[in-house]
Every structure is written in structure tokens, then in C-alpha cells.
């Protein structure tokens, strides 16, 4: 078997994907080549997620699948990386998963890289979060802060990723410059709570300052960011989004529930009225904004009446997208302790009922909102050609499909919308747009 081949398998959020892509870039920089399957690799990395139980189950299943490789080739190195690996559970995992050689905490790319046997080269410069530059990606995700200082009752992330740590502005800017110089057009800034960026840095720069700092990067066409928390969505940030043409009017602002009592139990730090007032202010400052949110159904203590108030809230605000999850218990969290009380636990069937009811409501709302685009022109950054059509995203992050001859990859085009569905738009190509920064 060819030596110095790696296999990276990733589950979880976009932060995990970005970490894995950065690791792959670094491994290639020290002389490794990617393997299409774990059986062909001598260095195997599993980047894990612990936000939901099914994500952990996927990783355990994958480890079970590859333990045969370890039996056949004992010198193969296997690394479990990511949010499953906390400061207090490594000894447990070592007993439970003896086929794994190393356990590494989230985002520690350099630590994983140091475990790769027999590197051929040394890295000349920090690796970029892109696994393959043969065809430059249109959109690249760049983490700007790690960890979380909040203490939401249901969330295990602070226990696994630790306290917030912001990257210096110049470090981020240099990375963005290098990425755009290689051909990327759109940068999405990532953070567990991205709008709390900078509070731990000298001078306390914030996300608005960072957006301003990155805005004139040569080659940069679009800037996005996710995920935000209502507590840090400042007037300064909103006015910056409205003023800077490369910053897309697209905000993900999780509310998690539409009942004040449940929000207090979740330790979210706001009421429905306060959140709704913020939404109204966002729409006042950025009239063309697209708004998405996250909602958990079946959280311990959520009654049917509380859920009905969540439906009412969604109907009133009319989000463009709602990411819906049935509550999943996470060991070590306040909510997991609550679920031990049968009076507070929500049965599986009831969770699914609530999830489906909310999905149906949001599908209707998304259908109605997208129908408002019919007959209008939208500006689309083209990301790929798939199934005979070009696909991209408009400024509001809506998927847009169109048919056209020629090569439109990475170009910004105007599309006349002739067709809508709940989750995408379709239309006819008008022509290329002279995008700012292109």
C-alpha cells in the first residue's frame, strides 16, 4: 500500500467542516495524499460532533467499521478528534475505544497534524481551510472565534470547546487575502456566537469592525457570517451590514423557542417580545434582509401550550428559513438533568409531532415568501453545475437554479425569477453582473 495517505471523516457543523478542510490542506502540505476510503490510508482522522446523540452514534459506528483495519494493519494511526473529546472523558474513551490511538480536542489542527507519521515536508505558512485547490471553491468558511461563554441549558458546546477565543483581526485578514488570491469569491465568517467576536482581544474590536476591515480585500465579492446570538446583535453591526455592499443581508438569529417561560428554562437571556423588537429593528435598518432561525422542539418542560406559542411566534415573524431540531439530551447539561424528571420529559412521539407541525408551517411561510420573488431579478453568485443546471445563491442566501450554455462558475449573474419552491428559486439568465470586488 502507498504510504503517507490520509482519510478524514467529518460529521457536524460547518466549523467542523472548516477544521477538517484546514487539516487536509496541512496534511497535503507536509506530503500526504488523500485516500478515497479508510482502508487505503495509514492515517485516519474522525472529526466528531456531540451536539446531538445521533452524531455521536455515527462516529461510534464508523470507528466500529474501521477497527478491522487496525487489526489487519496495527501501524495505522487512528485519531478521534472534535467535540466528542472533552477534558474529562478521554480516559473513558480510551477504555471504550482501544483501537483509537489518539484523542484530540476540537479545532486543534496543529495537534492532529503533529500526530501524522513520517511527514515529508514542513509547512511554509499556516494552512488554509480548503482541502483541494484544483478548482478554487467559490465560498470558503473562515472561523473567527472558537468556544462559547454562554450557558444554555441544552447545549454541550461550552463543555467541549471551552471559553470563547477570538482570532486577531490581522490574522483573519491575512487568511482571507490568501484565500481570495487563490480564486475564492465569498467568505463566510464562523463562530459559535459569531457576533460576540473580539471582546477578549486588545482594544475590543467587534464583528462590525472586522467586516469593515475585510471589506476591501482584493478579489472578495461577498461576506457572510454565522451563527449569531440576539444578545450581541448591535445597532452598530446592523448599520454596518446595511452600509457595506459586500456584506450580504442575510442573518441567522436563533430564537430556540417562542415561549418566555421556556426561554428562561433554556437560559437564553431574552423574551419573545425582546426578540421580536430586535427583528423589527433589523428589518427597519436592512429592509431587504433575509432572516433565518433555529428552534428546538420537545425541550424538557415544554408543554403543548408552550409549543403552540412557538407556532404563533413563527407565524408572526415569518422567517425565510427555520432550522428545526427535536431535543436531544446531552450528558452534563442542565436540560439532561431536567429530563430525568418524568413530568418534564417530552415523549419521542410528541417531539416528532411538534417537529412535523413546525416544518409544515414553515414550508407554507417559505412558499409564500419565495413567491414574492416571482418576476423579480436576483443577483446570484454561481457555485456549481449539477444535473444539467447552474446553481448559486442570491444575496439573501436563497438557492437559485438556471439553465445556460457556457461557463458561469464563480461568476455573479442576474437571474429573472420565473419559478419558486419553498427552498429554492428558478429563472432565466439575464447576464453577468459587474460585482464589487470581482
UniProtKB/Swiss-Prot annotation:
SUPFAM superfamilies: Radical SAM enzymes. Residues 4-125 form the MTTase N-terminal domain. It comes from Herpetosiphon aurantiacus (strain ATCC 23779 / DSM 785 / 114-95). One of its GO terms (cellular component) is cytosol. Keywords: 4Fe-4S, Cytoplasm, Iron, Iron-sulfur, Metal-binding, S-adenosyl-L-methionine, Transferase, tRNA processing. Monomer. Its EC number is 2.8.4.3. [4Fe-4S] cluster 2 binds at residues 148, 152, 155. Its cofactor is [4Fe-4S] cluster. Disulfide bonds: none annotated. Belongs to the methylthiotransferase family. MiaB subfamily. PROSITE patterns: MTTASE_N (PS51449), MTTASE_RADICAL (PS01278), RADICAL_SAM (PS51918), TRAM (PS50926). [4Fe-4S] cluster 1 binds at residues 13, 49, 83. Residues 371-431 form the TRAM domain. It catalyses: N(6)-dimethylallyladenosine(37) in tRNA + (sulfur carrier)-SH + AH2 + 2 S-adenosyl-L-methionine = 2-methylsulfanyl-N(6)-dimethylallyladenosine(37) in tRNA + (sulfur carrier)-H + 5'-deoxyadenosine + L-methionine + A + S-adenosyl-L-homocysteine + 2 H(+). It is found in: Cytoplasm. It holds the Pfam family TRAM. Gene3D superfamilies: Methylthiotransferase, N-terminal domain, tm_1862 like domain. Residues 134-368 form the Radical SAM core domain. This is tRNA-2-methylthio-N(6)-dimethylallyladenosine synthase. Binds 2 [4Fe-4S] clusters. One cluster is coordinated with 3 cysteines and an exchangeable S-adenosyl-L-methionine. Catalyzes the methylthiolation of N6-(dimethylallyl)adenosine (i(6)A), leading to the formation of 2-methylthio-N6-(dimethylallyl)adenosine (ms(2)i(6)A) at position 37 in tRNAs that read codons beginning with uridine. GO terms for molecular function: 4 iron, 4 sulfur cluster binding; metal ion binding; N6-isopentenyladenosine methylthiotransferase activity.
